Amino acid sequence: MGGKTFMLMAGGTGGHIFPALAVADSLRVRGHHVIWLGSKDSMEERIVPQYGIRLETLAIKGIRGNGIKRKLMLPFTLYKTVREAQRIIRKHRVECVIGFGGFVTFPGGLAAKLLGVPIVIHEQNAVAGLSNRHLSRWAKRVLYAFPKAFSHEGGLVGNPVRADISNLPVPAERFQGREGRLKILVVGGSLGADVLNKTVPQALALLPEEVRPQMYHQSGRNKLGNLQADYDALGVKAECVEFITDMVSAYRDADLVICRAGALTIAELTAAGLGALLVPYPHAVDDHQTANARFMVQAEAGLLLPQTQLTAEKLAEILGSLNREKCLKWAENARTLALPHSADDVAEAAIACAA
């Protein structure tokens, strides 16, 4: 068997899982072997095997805000999961582990440390997560998507995104020849964002019909009927879908996006070159979505609107002030932030550490 064996540690949310999948592809294209360490009964348990990657799981869940009993059990749980992770590393003869975040990353990383296996960390958010903060002390390489995610020195590589998004034409080429009302894409993630589903239709109803943007609105799971009913009741035309399967076309055709500010969303916006009205999820750990959003806003690639300030009236005021020229400028500024070779950069750093 040729190639080295890498263990990717990522779980809990798509923001950890999908960048790791992009790195897995980059490693496998180079002839290396990949296994995945995840949690039982998790998103990664449903997604990762579909990509032909061997999945190993630990019985571990989060410790933040989960009650005194779970925290009292933490030392025992950690001991048990670290031992299991050591067994997995030995079994597959892992030569380097790559941590992307999520509960499973810490016991997997600690197991690697105890076995003398090199650790590489990739942090997707502007504020480093708990597992990655701890593991960064032992990591051979610390990589991050946003400047200053860690207090110590590391490597800025961005967040891995799909190549077909990075390969979209530049904003000036996409915007050329566009006329009439703006076309706005609304996405709140695969589960949707209730506050966007409620407020966006109300805001559009406050605008004169002749200046209302054209809306392409992803409702999220099990929310399409209510969203479409709200638009209809307000007399506002919009194209609503439960889930957008072709995000490349959606990004290509949009003038602007209204969305949350998860790390993967920011990475895709910058890769595509799209400005955004960002409404960070207010309950994200360490308020990392607000920090993510500021990254784009500071580059004049969009606006940050805290959820506490999101009203139909405020949103209508913002939408009414926009024009295609401003959206194009935001899109061009967003594209300057893109780091399209992120997956390859992470893979090459890990290969060097495993040498």
From Swiss-Prot:
InterPro entries: GlcNAc_MurG, Glyco_trans_28_C, GlycoTrans_28_N. CDD domains: GT28_MurG. Its EC number is 2.4.1.227. It is found in: Cell inner membrane. It is a peripheral membrane protein. Its main location: membrane. It catalyses: di-trans,octa-cis-undecaprenyl diphospho-N-acetyl-alpha-D-muramoyl-L-alanyl-D-glutamyl-meso-2,6-diaminopimeloyl-D-alanyl-D-alanine + UDP-N-acetyl-alpha-D-glucosamine = di-trans,octa-cis-undecaprenyl diphospho-[N-acetyl-alpha-D-glucosaminyl-(1->4)]-N-acetyl-alpha-D-muramoyl-L-alanyl-D-glutamyl-meso-2,6-diaminopimeloyl-D-alanyl-D-alanine + UDP + H(+). Pathway: Cell wall biogenesis; peptidoglycan biosynthesis. Keywords: Cell cycle, Cell division, Cell inner membrane, Cell membrane, Cell shape, Cell wall biogenesis/degradation, Glycosyltransferase, Membrane, Peptidoglycan synthesis, Transferase. GO terms for biological process: carbohydrate metabolic process; cell division; cell wall organization; lipid glycosylation; peptidoglycan biosynthetic process; regulation of cell shape. UDP-N-acetyl-alpha-D-glucosamine binds at T13, G14, G15, N125, R162, S190, I244, Q289. GO terms for cellular component: plasma membrane. GO terms for molecular function: UDP-N-acetyl-D-glucosamine:N-acetylmuramoyl-L-alanyl-D-glutamyl-meso-2,6-diaminopimelyl-D-alanyl-D-alanine-diphosphoundecaprenol 4-beta-N-acetylglucosaminlytransferase activity; undecaprenyldiphospho-muramoylpentapeptide beta-N-acetylglucosaminyltransferase activity. Pfam families: Glyco_tran_28_C, Glyco_transf_28. Belongs to the glycosyltransferase 28 family. MurG subfamily. Cell wall formation. Catalyzes the transfer of a GlcNAc subunit on undecaprenyl-pyrophosphoryl-MurNAc-pentapeptide (lipid intermediate I) to form undecaprenyl-pyrophosphoryl-MurNAc-(pentapeptide)GlcNAc (lipid intermediate II). This is UDP-N-acetylglucosamine--N-acetylmuramyl-(pentapeptide) pyrophosphoryl-undecaprenol N-acetylglucosamine transferase. The lineage of its organism: Bacteria, Pseudomonadati, Pseudomonadota, Betaproteobacteria, Neisseriales.
